[in-house]
């Protein structure tokens, strides 16, 4: 049985000649070693591999050796002693051999696959020949060719010999039952370099060193910081790298980064050919930049300078005219800006006036609503239970004040009763104004569990200046709790408020 690609247990087993002579660990039917085979025995102790037993019992229900009756495979017993003893035999690791054997084996496997394909094609041809009624002589020739191919394979397998890699191979001796796990973890296994383009195959324990030096590893350019460059192509990259330092191609002996060379040649290099500064005005001489100063000193450029002065004067005149036009446009813009600012101020004043009228109108509407419909709100008192404990009879607390048409009012509550209402909740409406007011008012203690049980008290009174009116015995204090519905789960008491200012009827005009 194959343990890795083309390898068999015979390739790595130690003392295999001795084991084969004893025939103790070989199936007596198929003559294969019992590596990774399930071994079963008859009642007389004769054993063979599971595959051989199954094939034999399909033909005859008897032992292949002693001929004792075996009705079915279920009548056999597992021969664990033989299996366990063989699993403890020693063997070499497959990676103790040279790489050449792995490569040759891989090539041989490819050849075997090709031969199988050819055989399949031959079989198809044979079927076609039979259908077409060809002679049996062609079949005999094909069979002879197949036999020759098999003989050639056997000869090639005999020629292939495993050669130990004494210097770099795995030297560990392991038990048969540990072979698969060792192969998976062996540090001497053959692996391929992970870098794309590198076909190098080497042992795992030398992979890291190789990959650090591999010509196909990706590196970063030290000049332009470009990454993802293959090591062997780095020199080619330097030929194009914009930050690689090179000498001036015009031989001025200065060095610059490649992307700065163009600017150097156009603006600074003494060996660059340039035109005389008066070239546009008639001096058509070209020279190296280093010779410009000597040219200017040795050649009379007065005529050319005169042309330059004339051109500059003309340009200056045009600039002055443009400046005058721009100044006029600026003055026009200033006038326009002033006019726009004035209109903006007018609009701002108009907007302010509209806003004032709007708010005055809203105030009037709100005052009218309060006058005609009355003031409606609610007073929610938090932590009422603590308030009862901390406000003894006859102390009280005030609600936040509220205004009705510029008149101030407030509600007072006595949790434990006023002077005349001990052990009761007392509620009063206070007129905090110096003028008397005729008021229609309602105070309602809200029952949160059943709104129909809410207690409402109504009054129609004339309040003199700084006076209160209300009820000293609104509800017994001991009844106000969560169970009865007067307090919420978070201990809040709610009082609804309604107050309306009443005015005397206007008397008719008489004459």
Curated annotation (Swiss-Prot):
One GO CC term, this protein: cytoplasm
PROSITE patterns: MATH (PS50144), ZF_TRAF (PS50145)
Coiled coil is among the record's keywords: yes
A matching Pfam family: MATH_2
Region (Disordered): 107-159
GO terms assigned for molecular function: zinc ion binding
Location in or out of the cell: Cytoplasm
Zinc finger (RING-type): 27-67
InterPro entries xrefs: MATH/TRAF_dom, TRAF-like, Znf_RING/FYVE/PHD, Znf_TRAF
Ranges for domain MATH: 374-499
Bias (Acidic residues) ranges: 109-155
Keywords on record: Coiled coil, Cytoplasm, Metal-binding, Repeat, Zinc, Zinc-finger
Coiled-coil portions: 103-169, 324-358
Start and end residues, zinc fingers (TRAF-type): 181-234, 236-293
CDD domains per the UniProt record, alphabetical: MATH
Family label: Belongs to the TNF receptor-associated factor family. A subfamily.
Entry text on domains: The MATH/TRAF domain binds to receptor cytoplasmic domains.
Function of the molecule: Probable adapter protein and signal transducer that links members of the tumor necrosis factor receptor family to different signaling pathways by association with the receptor cytoplasmic domain and kinases.
Name of this chain's protein: TNF receptor-associated factor family protein DDB_G0290931
Organism: Dictyostelium discoideum (Social amoeba)
């Amino acid at each position: 049985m194959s343990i890795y690609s083309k390898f068999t247990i015979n390739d790595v087993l130690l003392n295999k000649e001795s084991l084969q002579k004893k025939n103790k660990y070989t199936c007596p039917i198929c003559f294969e070693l019992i590596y990774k085979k399930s071994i079963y025995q008859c009642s007389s102790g004769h054993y063979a591999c599971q595959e051989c037993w199954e094939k034999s019992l399909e033909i005859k229900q008897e032992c292949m050796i002693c001929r004792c009756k075996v009705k079915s495979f279920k009548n056999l017993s597992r021969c664990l002693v033989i299996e366990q003893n063989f699993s403890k035999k020693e063997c070499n690791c497959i990676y103790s051999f040279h790489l050449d054997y792995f490569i040759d084996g891989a090539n041989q496997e490819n050849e075997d696959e090709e031969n199988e394909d050819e055989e399949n094609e031959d079989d198809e041809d044979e079927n076609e020949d039979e259908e077409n009624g060809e002679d049996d002589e062609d079949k005999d020739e094909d069979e002879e060719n197949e036999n020759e191919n098999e003989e050639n394979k056997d000869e090639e397998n005999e020629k292939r010999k495993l050669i130990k890699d004494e210097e770099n191979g795995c030297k560990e001796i392991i038990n048969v039952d540990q072979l698969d796990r060792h192969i998976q973890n062996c540090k001497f296994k053959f692996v391929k370099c992970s870098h794309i383009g590198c076909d190098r195959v080497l042992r795992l324990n030398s992979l890291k060193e190789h990959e650090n030096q591999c010509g196909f590893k990706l590196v970063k350019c030290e000049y332009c910081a470009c990454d993802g460059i293959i090591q062997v192509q780095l020199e080619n990259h330097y030929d194009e790298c914009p930050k690689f330092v090179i000498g001036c191609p015009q031989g001025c002996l200065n060095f610059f980064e490649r992307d700065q060379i163009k600017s150097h040649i156009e603006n600074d290099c003494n060996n660059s050919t340039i035109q005389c500064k008066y070239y546009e005005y008639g001096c058509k001489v070209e020279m190296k930049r280093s010779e410009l100063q000597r040219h200017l000193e040795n050649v009379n450029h007065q005529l050319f300078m005169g042309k330059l002065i004339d051109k500059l004067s003309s340009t200056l005149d045009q600039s002055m005219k443009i400046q005058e036009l721009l100044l006029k446009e600026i003055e026009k813009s200033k006038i326009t800006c002033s006019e726009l600012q004035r209109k903006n101020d007018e609009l701002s004043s108009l907007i302010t006036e509209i806003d004032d009228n709007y708010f005055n109108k809203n105030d009037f509407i709100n005052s009218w609503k309060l006058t005609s419909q009355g003031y409606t709100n609610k007073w929610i008192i938090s932590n009422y239970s603590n308030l009862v404990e901390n406000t003894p009879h006859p102390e009280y607390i005030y609600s936040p004040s509220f205004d009705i048409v510029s008149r101030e009012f407030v509600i007072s509550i006595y949790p434990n009763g006023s002077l005349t209402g001990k052990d009761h909740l007392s509620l009063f409406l206070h007129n905090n104004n110096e003028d008397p007011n005729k008021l229609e008012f309602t105070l309602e203690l809200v029952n949160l569990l059943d709104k129909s049980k809410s207690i409402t008290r109504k009054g129609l009174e004339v309040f003199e200046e700084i006076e209160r009116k209300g009820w000293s015995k609104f509800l017994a204090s001991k009844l106000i709790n969560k169970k009865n519905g007067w307090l919420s789960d978070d201990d809040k008491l709610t009082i609804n408020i309604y107050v309306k200012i009443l005015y005397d009827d206007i008397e008719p005009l008489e004459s």
